[in-house]
């Protein structure tokens, strides 16, 4: 199992590395046993959307291990784009950022189980 750690909270995560995985994201999926989805990408401006998603989510942009932008409670299938700069994006079930007080400036640590690298 892979995890991300923000503050003192550990979240199980599914790591998305390929362009195909990035394009699929949470489309047509539920959280089904994971706390988050971690998108590892080249640091630059990225745009995420919730088209074809069936669950609301929080979208968090991360750069150099720090949270730089937070979009809480993104409506599924809204057609809206969520833009930010970063080398990673983390998607959480809606209200996670409020429940765990996740804000810009916090450190994000990715822990990968050796069998999943």
Sequence positions of predicted segments:
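Compact, glycine-rich, soluble single-domain proteins
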Residues: 1-117
């Amino acid at each position: 199992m892979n995890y991300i750690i923000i503050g003192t909270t550990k979240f199980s995560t599914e790591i998305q590395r390929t362009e195909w995985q990035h394009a699929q994201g949470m489309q047509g999926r539920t959280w089904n046993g994971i706390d988050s989805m971690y998108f590892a990408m080249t640091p630059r401006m990225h745009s995420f959307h919730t088209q074809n998603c069936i669950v609301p989510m929080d979208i968090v942009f991360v750069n150099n291990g720090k949270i730089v932008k937070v979009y809480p409670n993104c409506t599924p299938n809204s057609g809206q784009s969520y833009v930010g700069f970063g080398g990673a994006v983390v998607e959480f079930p809606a209200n996670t950022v409020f429940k765990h007080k996740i804000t810009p400036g916090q450190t994000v640590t990715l822990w990968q189980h050796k069998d999943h690298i």
